[in-house]
């Protein structure tokens, strides 16, 4: 299982998870949902307490990935499998992306706290 923090305008909005079977889930943090001034990260992922599930990477996140020759270069330079969409996402959107959303890999200490 791999997890990443999803930030909206540099504030942590929720957690994106890739499960061992390759499926994905996304959940907003409770405090994000409770705060009326915070908006959804996407129209396709409306702000709610429920967890979203998908067999594939959610289209919102998939559309943040590089394509074509850019994808080839990024994968080669970072030694990422071309089919590893989660790895590609956290590599290419950790510092900068088009729009207000960035995605950052959670380190082992954060995973222990989150699962503890």
Description of each model-found segment:
Residues 1-116:
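Phosphate/dinucleotide-binding and metal-coordinating scaffold of catalytic cores
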């Amino acid at each position: 299982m791999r997890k990443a923090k999803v930030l909206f305008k540099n504030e942590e909005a929720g957690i994106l998870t890739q499960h061992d079977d390759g499926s994905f889930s996304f959940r907003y943090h409770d405090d994000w949902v409770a705060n009326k001034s915070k908006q959804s990260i996407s129209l396709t992922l409306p702000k709610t307490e429920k967890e979203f599930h998908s067999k594939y990477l959610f289209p919102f996140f998939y559309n943040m990935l590089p394509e074509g020759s850019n994808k080839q270069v990024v994968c080669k330079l970072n030694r990422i499998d071309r089919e590893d969409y989660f790895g590609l996402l956290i590599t290419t959107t950790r510092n900068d992306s088009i729009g207000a959303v960035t995605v950052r890999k959670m380190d082992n200490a954060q995973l222990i706290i989150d699962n503890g």
